[in-house]
Amino acid sequence: MELKEAYETICTYLNESEKRKLLESNLTGAFKGGVVKPIYKDLVKQHLPYIDYPFKDEMDNVFCYRQNDEKPGLNVLHFGGVYYLLDPSSAFVPNQFSKNDKTNLVLDMCAAPGGKTITYAIKHPNDLIIANEISLSRANELAKNIERMGLANVIVTCMDPQEINDSFNSIFDRILLDAPCSGSGMFCKEPKMLEDWTYDKVIKCSLIQKQLLKKAIKLCALNGEILYSTCSYSNEEDDEVIEATLDESIEIVNINSSFDTYKTKYGNILFPYIFNGEGQYVSKLRKIKGDKIDINLLKSNNVDKIEKQYVIHPLLKKLPAGLKIIKPGIKIYDNREHSKIIYANDYKFLCPIKKVEITYEQACSFIKGSEVFLNTNYSKKEEVVVTYKDIPLGYGRIVSNKIKNLLPKGLYAPNIRL
C-alpha cells in the first residue's frame, strides 16, 4: 500500500487539504528530538548546534532536529544521562496532566522503551512512577534507560497490566497508557509499519486497547487522571476506544495546551503538519466516581531487604505486595560492586567518593573503554567517579597518573563521536 492510499483509507475524517498536508509533511521527513534535564539545556545546545528548542511552557526542555545524518546518541552527554532521544509528540503526552501540589503515585502501564516515563520523571522528581512493561526483554531495556538517566523516582516492573491485582485498584493518582497500536503515526519513521499495516491489525489492537483502558480506570484513584495515547491515526484505536469504555465514573477533560493540535470528539491528534513530531493521539480522562482509598491504611509491601541495598522512594513502602519489580530504585554504593553503579547525577544519590574531571576528548576515550592519562601524579590508589562538566560517566581507579577504566565492557561505546 502506498502512503497516499493508506491515509485515504485511515484518515477519512480529514478533508482533502488536510490529507495533502499530512502526506507532504511525511515526505519531508519526520522531526526527531529529545528531552533534556533543564539545567543542561545550554550545554546540550553547545554540543548539538543543529538542535532547536521550539517549544515553550511545559515542553521547554524538549528539543527538535531535522537532519537525518546527525547522531546525537553518539555524544558523551547522551551517555551521561543528560538527555533522552524521543519523538517530540511523544514528549507532549506526559506533560498534559492537570497541575497539583501533591506527591503523586504514577503508573505507566506500557512503558518501554521509557520515553514518557523519563519525560515525566525529569519534570516531577518528587513523584513516584511505576514503569511497567509486559515483555521481560523490553523491561530490561527500560531499566537500562532509567539507570542511564539516573532517575531515583522510577521503579521498573514486568507484569501483564491485566494481572495487576485488585489491591492496587483506585490508588494511582496519574496513569499513562500508551497502548500498543497499529502504528499509522509511524509510517514516516518506520516504513515497514506501512508494509505491515492491515485493517485486521487495527481491530485486534482496538480490542486490547479497550481492555487496557478498562483496567486503567479500575486502577485510577478518585479524582485521578488517565492519559490514553497511541501512535495510530485510526479512529477505531482512538476516539472509539474512549467511547466504548466511558461510563458514569469517568469524564473527558479538555487538554488546555499552548500548542496547536487536531481536535477530535474525545481527544487531540498531533499531526506532523501541525506539530513538530511524528504523530500521536492523546485523550485525557478523570475519574469522578469510585472508592476513595487511603494508601496509608493499606497493608504495605515488605521492603526491608530492598531498603538495605537501594535508595527507594518513600511511597514504595506504602504500596501493597504483588509488584514484580526489576529495578526498585537506586543501588546504594558498595565498593565490592562498583561495576553495577554506573550512573549518578542530579536525580541520583551519589556515593561520597572523589570525583575527577576530564576533558571531552578524554571522556570519549573513557567511554570507549580506554584508560585516561592525567597531568597529575596521585600517590593514593583509590576509586573515583569520572566526570565531564560535572556529569558522572562511570567509575575508575586512580593509579599514579592514570585512571584505570572500571566501566563494564557491555557499556563501552566504541562509536562515540568527538
Model-derived features: where do they sit?
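Polybasic, low-complexity RNA-engagement segments
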Residues: M1-L48, N276-Y281, I288-L418
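A short acidic, Gly/Pro-enriched loop at the edge of an enzyme's catalytic core
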Residues: D101, E163-L176
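Conserved class I S-adenosyl-L-methionine
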Residues: K102-A112
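Conserved SAM-binding loop of SAM-dependent methyltransferases across substrates and taxa
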Residues: P113-P125
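Helix-to-beta-strand junctions that scaffold the AdoMet/dcAdoMet cofactor pocket
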Residues: H124, C220-L222
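S-adenosyl-L-methionine
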Residues: N132-N169
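Mobile active-site "lid"/loop adjacent to the S-adenosyl-L-methionine
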Residues: S137, R174-K214, C231-D238, S257-S258
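Class I S-adenosyl-L-methionine
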Residues: F172, E225-Y228, S232-Y310
